[in-house]
Amino acid sequence: MILRRLVLSATSNSNPRRSQSLSSSGVRILSSSSSDRYTSSSQRYSGDDRLARLRHKDWLAPNEVLKIFDNVKDPSFLLPAYQHYSKRKDYQPTESLYALMINKFGQAKMYDEIEEVMRTIKLEKRCRFSEEFFYNLMRIYGNLAGRINRAIEILFGMPDFGCWPSSKSFNFILNLLVSAKLFDEIHKIFVSAPKLGVEIDACCLNILIKGLCESGNLEAALQLLDEFPQQKSRPNVMTFSPLIRGFCNKGKFEEAFKLLERMEKERIEPDTITFNILISGLRKKGRVEEGIDLLERMKVKGCEPNPGTYQEVLYGLLDKKRNLEAKEMMSQMISWGMRPSFLSYKKMVLGLCETKSVVEMDWVLRQMVNHGFVPKTLMWWKVVQCVVSKNNDDSQANLDRITAC
C-alpha cells in the first residue's frame, strides 16, 4: 500500500539518535524497597479514620467503597486499604475503583503502585474494562510520566483484558510519538493497526502528515493527501495547515498557495491559523505587501483575524521601517481591545527615534506604559538622545512630557 511505503521510506531517513528504545517488557513487580514502603503504609493506614468503615462488618455497596477510597488524601494508604477490602465478603472491584486509585497514584507520581494495581487486575480478572480506562492509563504514562514505551505496551496489551482499542487510543500514541519527535517508531505502530483492529481515519492521516512535515519529508506528506479517498476519509483544515507551514518555512510559497487553492476547490474553508501561517511566512521573507493583501482577503472570505494576525502584519511594517503605517495599525489594535507585544512597542520606539518623530513616540510610550510594559534603560537613553538632538526650542518641553510617563 502506498501509505505504508511512504511512512516507511520517510521515517527510515530520520535521525536514529532521536529514536527511543521501545522494547516490550512485562509488568514491573514492586521492588523490596517498595515492599517496605507498602508495609509502612499498612501500619499508618490502620489508624486512618476515613478508612474505618472498611474494618466494619456492614455490607458495602461498590458506590460506597468508591466514596471511601475517594476520601483518602494520602495515596500511600490506597494499596493497604485495597488489600483489606479484597479480604471482605462483599469484595467487588469495579473499573471506577481501579481508575480512581490509578488517577491518585498518577497525580502523586507513584508509578510503581500503578504497576501493582495492573498486576492485580491481570491476575484477578474480576471485571471488564472500557477503552476509556486504558486511554487514561496511556495518558498518565505518556504525558505525566514521560514513559512512552509503557504507554505503547498498554495499547498492545488491551486485547489481553478483552478490550480492543479504537482509533482514539491508536491516534493518541501516534500523536505522542510525533510530539516526542520519535519518527522512526511511527511506522512500527502504524503497520500494527490491522492487528489491533483499528481502522485508519482522517485524524490518523493528519497525525502522519504532521509527523512527516516536522521531520522535513514534505513530498511524502504531500503524497499522503491522495490516501484519504482510499481510506474513505476526507481531508480537513488540520490536514493542510502543517503542509502549508512546512512549505512556508522552506520559502516555497508557490507550493503553499497551491495548497490554499486546493483547499478552496475541495470546499475546505481555511481558518485563521492557516492564514496566520501564510502571513507569518511572508513577513519573515520580507514580503509585507502580500501579507497585507492576505489579511484583506481573509476578511472578505469572512475569516475573522485574531490578535496574532494583526501582530504579524505589524511586525512586517516595523521591519520595513514603515513606522507611521505601523502606528496606525497599532492604534487600531488598541481600539479593538488588543494588546501589541513588548517587542512591537520596542521596535516602534526605536524606529521613531531614527526618524526623530517625537510626537508619535510620545503616544507610543504612553500606550506602552498603559499596557503594563516598562521601557528598559537603553530604550529611554535612545529616547532622550532623540529629543535632545532635535535642537529646537521645544526640546526641553518634549523631554519633560515624555519623562512624565
UniProtKB/Swiss-Prot annotation:
Main location, first listed in the record: mitochondrion
Entry GO CC: mitochondrion
Record's subcellular location: Mitochondrion
Transit peptide, from-to: 1-37
One Pfam family per UniProt: PPR_2
Start-end of each PPR repeat: 94-124, 130-165, 166-200, 201-235, 236-270, 271-305, 306-340, 341-375
Name of the protein in its database record: Pentatricopeptide repeat-containing protein At3g14580, mitochondrial
Region (Disordered): 13-44
Keywords: Mitochondrion, Repeat, Transit peptide
Family note: Belongs to the PPR family. P subfamily.
